[in-house]
Structures are given as structure tokens and as C-alpha cells.
A protein has these predicted regions:
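Single, function-defining residue in the core of a domain
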Residues: 1-14, 22, 108, 146-447
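Short alpha-helix boundary/capping elements
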Residues: 34-39, 53, 104, 340, ...
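Gly/Ser/Thr-rich loops at beta-strand to alpha-helix junctions
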Residues: 36, 101-103, 200-205
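Gly/serine-rich nucleotide phosphate-binding loop at the start of the catalytic core
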Residues: 1-64
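Short coil/turn segments at secondary-structure boundaries
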Residues: 24-27, 42-47, 75-76, 94, ...
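A residue-level signal for conserved active-site and pocket-lining positions in enzyme catalytic cores
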Residues: 45, 137, 371
Length: 447
């Protein structure tokens, strides 16, 4: 396929994961998905390629529902490409993990279940919706063209409810258990890089923290204000009968620490939401997080209080006691960029518009669309050799930095320019298109 050299350099990294026929069809589906708007289906991608009269169209469906190619290997290649492109050698790799709901209603989808719908729920009412719940891992990176951090997905795993797991005859695994199985793979893939795994309260699990400690991965998550924290056990001066104690005296609840006037607070400016910083009061300490019948988990906790009273007092913890409070707060705040990725993917890449119902096609299509978000950012970065990216501005909207929509425009523009200006070596055609009309046409197609 005739593509710009910068885009070819990005997609060529994934050739080892596919056979030659599958790779060529996958490349065509990717380009067609980028060029079309609306529903992202295989038929729509073929229309975007101009292959709507292809008689052997079923072979493109086979890429998703039948062909043999390793999804985990493709995720490894994407993760390696993201880290080598945006993370300096030896720099910290911040991996955000979260779940998102893809609303699907077909009775043919075997792994469809009822999940809490965070978009429709509120603090007073919880709403459940039928669909597919995805566990998404993304690398949070800083890019040169904006002050905001971007979360680039590289791995998506389909979760199931206990009822669906029982119907399929498979053991049910919670979100934290599935995440714990990915931690060793992360460490093997990113050997030599310090890793910060950031999640919400769903990942504040002692067992997950112990797995992260065993593989030298720092887990950062919120901590309950009534968590059972203990001091380290004291060594007895003389031998005693029985088992040695695993924890020492019980520490006060963090809620009591926040209300205690004797608590020593420190005030500093920390990274906050919206690529800003805020002045916060904080206090920190180390403790053993313990529950009966489990090994204790050594954590560093941070209690954050807003001196202006705008935000509630919150507590965070990390499984790496050597991290500073500023690193812990900044790591958790960076997790929010994954929510922006969800919204951008739904708005511009057609998440939730797929119509496959076979198990293999479902488990491949949505992760491929999330990965396409990362590929668009990588392609735009490769196309902007001078660091300049287009930023669409209007008289009524003062846009200061390019967004994902602008990156998608840049990639589409490069592909369309290759399509419009292809020439034959033997009988080249000369197209006389005025620049203003061409730019209007190109903007209409790409936007």
C-alpha cells in the first residue's frame, strides 16, 4: 500500500507479529478505519479504501475472526515502541490501568454482562448497563506539542462477570487478579525501566501490592481513611514461645490523623488535574497494611488536604516506600488522562460502533481500536519532524494546543496527499488543482 514513509516506519514495527497476507490485510483495514467517519466496521473500512466492489470481501473479516496472530505479542511491540519514542532511557514509565464499558446488547455475545455504568450513575443512584467491560493498560507520556499528558493504550483485556464466568465454565477472576497477572509481563517487557502502576480504588488491594513489590513495580492507588495500618513489629529482648509477631501496634486511622490538631502538615505545590499545579497540605508516613491471615504489606501513605477547602481530604498509598509524596500525588493525577483517551476514542475512532458478535472478533476489534489511538499519536509524532502540529482555530474558539482531532487530521492529510498525488512512472498525470480549493476539499475529507 502506498503510504508516507513516516507512517510506514511506524507500522513496520508490527510486521514480525503477523504473516505476510495477514499483515497486508491488517494494514488495509487500519488505513480504511482512519479515513472513514462514523461506524468502524470492516465493511466501512473497505468503503474507505475504495474496495466496496471487492468480491472476496470475506477475507478481511477473517483477519479478526479467524486468522492466527498473537495479540499479546502485538501489545508488546506497541508498548516497546511507545516507551522508546516518548520515554527517555532509564526514565519512569507510568502505566495507568482502568476499566471502561462498551455498551453492547446482542444476545449472541457470550461474554456480555451487566456492569455498573459510571456514565449514567451518580452518587445517589447506581445504574447497570449491559455490555463488555475492558481492562485497559496505557502508558502516560508527555508530548512536545501540548502541556497535557496523553495516555496511550497498549493492552486491553475483556473482563467477565461471575455469572458469565460460571456459564462459560471458567474460574472467575477479579479486576485486581487479572491486573496481577499482567504485572510480571510488564516487568519482563520493560526490563531496566522503573514502572509506576497507577489505578483507582479498585486496585487498592493488598495482594496486588505484594505482587508489585515482588516484581519491583510501584503500585499507586487511593487508600481508605479507615485502613488497618500497623507499626513494624519490635524484636523481643528474650526468646518467647509461639510465632513471632508480624505487625506491631495499631496506628490511628488516617481520618483521625487528619482531624488531630497535633498532626504536622507540610505545604507545597503539587501537580494537579488539567495540567496545572495546586497548593496542598500533606503529611506522610510508612506503615504495614495488614489483615488477619495475610502477609503485611509495607506501604507509604500520603494524606492530602486542601487548605482552601475546595477538595475533600484524600489518602493515597504506594507499594514503594522510597517514593516522595509529590511523586505519589503526581502519579495518581496522571491517571485521569486515560479518561480523556476513552472519550476521544469514542468520538473519533468509533468505539462502541462495531457490530461483530463472534468471541475472537470481539476480543480483537476493541483492543485494536484502542491501539489505533496510540498509533495515531505515534504517526503524528513521526510526521511532525519540526515539532509543529496543526491546530484548528476559529473566531469563536481560541484553541491554544492541538488535540487528538488535530493529530487525526494530520495523519489523514498525509494519507490523502499520497492518494491524490500518486503518479505513474511511465505516464505521469499532471493535476492542476488550485491551492485554496484543494485545502478546502482536504479539510472537508479529513474533518
Amino acid at each position: 500500500m502506498f503510504l508516507p514513509a513516516e507512517i510506514i516506519a511506524v507500522v513496520e514495527c508490527f510486521r514480525p507479529a503477523f504473516t505476510r497476507p495477514t499483515y497486508e490485510k491488517m494494514l488495509e483495514l487500519m488505513v480504511g478505519t482512519l479515513l472513514i467517519r462514523g461506524r468502524r466496521t470492516v465493511a466501512g473500512a473497505l468503503r474507505g479504501l475504495g474496495k466496496d466492489q471487492e468480491t472476496n470481501w470475506s477475507k478481511y473479516h477473517h483477519v479478526l475472526n479467524r486468522a492466527k496472530w498473537p495479540g499479546l505479542e502485538a501489545s508488546r511491540l506497541l508498548l516497546t515502541l511507545i516507551v522508546t519514542t516518548f520515554v527517555p532511557v532509564g526514565g519512569i514509565v507510568t502505566v495507568a490501568v482502568d476499566e471502561t464499558l462498551e455498551r453492547r446488547w446482542s444476545p449472541r455475545i457470550s461474554k456480555c454482562g451487566y456492569w455498573r455504568d459510571s456514565r449514567s450513575s451518580s452518587k445517589r443512584m447506581s445504574v447497570s448497563s449491559r455490555g463488555l467491560r475492558w481492562l485497559v493498560f496505557a502508558v502516560v507520556v508527555r508530548v512536545p506539542w501540548t502541556a497535557y499528558e496523553l495516555a496511550l493504550p497498549f493492552l486491553s483485556i475483556l473482563l467477565t462477570t461471575p455469572k458469565v464466568s460460571a456459564a462459560l465454565g471458567k474460574p472467575h477472576r477479579t479486576t485486581a487478579e487479572v491486573t496481577g497477572r499482567i504485572v510480571p509481563w510488564l516487568r519482563r517487557t520493560l526490563a531496566g525501566y522503573p514502572i509506576h502502576l497507577v489505578g483507582d480504588h479498585t486496585y487498592a488491594v493488598r495482594e496486588l501490592g505484594r505482587i508489585c513489590q515482588a516484581h519491583q513495580v510501584a503500585l499507586i492507588a487511593p487508600l481508605r481513611l479507615n485502613a488497618r495500618l500497623f507499626e513494624a513489629p519490635c524484636r523481643p529482648r528474650e526468646k518467647r514461645r509461639g510465632r513471632p509477631p508480624v505487625v506491631g501496634a495499631r496506628l490511628p486511622n488516617l481520618n483521625d490523623v487528619a482531624m488531630n490538631p497535633a498532626t504536622r502538615w507540610q505545604r507545597s505545590r503539587v501537580a494537579w488535574y488539567g495540567a496545572t499545579s495546586a497548593i496542598m497540605d500533606w503529611t506522610t508516613g510508612t506503615a504495614l497494611w495488614y489483615a488477619t491471615g495475610e502477609p503485611p504489606l509495607l506501604v507509604r501513605w500520603v494524606l492530602v488536604r486542601d487548605p482552601a477547602g475546595k477538595y475533600p481530604t484524600r489518602a493515597f498509598f504506594t507499594s514503594d516506600p522510597h517514593l516522595t509524596p509529590a511523586q505519589i500525588v503526581a502519579g495518581f493525577v496522571a491517571r485521569w488522562s486515560l479518561e480523556v483517551t476513552y472519550e476521544e476514542s469514542r468520538a473519533h475512532l468509533g468505539i462502541e460502533t462495531q457490530r461483530q458478535w463472534s468471541d475472537k472478533a470481539i476480543e480483537r476489534t476493541t483492543p485494536a481500536l484502542f491501539a489505533l489511538f496510540s498509533l495515531v499519536v505515534l504517526m503524528a509524532h513521526a510526521l511532525s519532524t519540526d515539532g509543529h502540529l496543526p491546530c484548528r482555530r476559529t473566531a469563536w474558539y481560541a484553541k491554544t494546543a492541538p488535540t487528538f482531532h488535530d493529530l487525526l487530521f494530520l495523519v489523514r492529510q498525509a494519507i490523502w496527499q499520497q492518494i491524490l498525488f500518486q503518479t505513474d512512472d511511465f505516464s505521469p498525470d499532471l493535476r492542476n488543482i488550485s491551492s485554496p480549493h484543494f485545502e478546502r476539499l482536504l479539510a472537508a475529507v479529513c474533518y
